[in-house]
């Protein structure tokens, strides 16, 4: 079985917020899940060690006219790109009619997504919680984890001279929109 999840929000933090839901899909169906994400999510750089992620597929869609998946031509290119993977199921983490139609055109049989046409002031995680609970009967602990290779962690400890006996502070600058507060 091959499963795709679409998370097309902009940044790293947006992608991280959805990891518990993607992991729940993987655990429910006992297969790693492929992700369709925007390049600026950097998912290909920080999720490449996650055992519940199969492939990272980049959505080439931006305000630049020459982006591969922009416009009506891009719509069909994306459908063609996804069709090659022969996905059985897709979880679309937004209310997009575009992605619903692309999934249909790609031949994906089982499509799960947020209710269509209900985007206004949509909270970032509540629809994901509802989607997973409704379709998988799974309660999610919204506590994202990123799997990292222990060697990378040890290299960072050495490089930045991190010591357990000292207070280490990490600032995570991110979204401030009310829809992104959890």
Give the residues covered by each predicted segment.
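Catalytic machinery of carbohydrate-active enzymes
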Residues: 1-182
